[in-house]
Amino acid sequence: MRAVGLHEDVIAVTSRAYATGCVLVRSGAEAFCIDSPVFPDELEALPALAEQAGFTVVGRLAPHADWDHLLAAYAFPDAPLGAGETTAARLINEPGDAQRLMREFDDEFYVTRPRPLSLSGTQQLPVPGHVEIGERSLELHPADGHTADGTAVWVPWARVLIAGDYLSPVEIP
């Protein structure tokens, strides 16, 4: 796992799995974890990385409902999960799919997780829309294409766009 500061309020974290990433975003005393790394050791290290950088994670955001974007629950189990309307609908309409696909990945790569993945209580967010963080707000924009339920997050004060799977140095077959 690699972490890079993009701005004093933004840290990009890249997983060993497919070079996927997550982004920690802070405003004042609050921070969100957007997306997630994949492997258990990366998820276990994420809270310490956030704390060391002064990011108190109070919420999680999922850019879409693919299993590898929902794993921040392992790192921040007490932080509620927010997702765009279409992502929340996909989680409701495809119950257990994310967990099943995660188990298939784990079986193939001999990954052991500390507990089952829980996605209950997902907060549905309007897209396009805003979500408050500290004294500021993040902009949520529709980003269908890779999936029908994609959401991109714009961090206006840092001028950072979090695009989920749309930008990657790795081509996944």
Segment roles from a protein language model:
Residues 1-53, 57, 116-173:
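Catalytic core of the metallo-beta-lactamase
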Residues 43-44, 48-126, 130:
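Active-site HxH/HxHxD metal-binding segment of metal-dependent hydrolases
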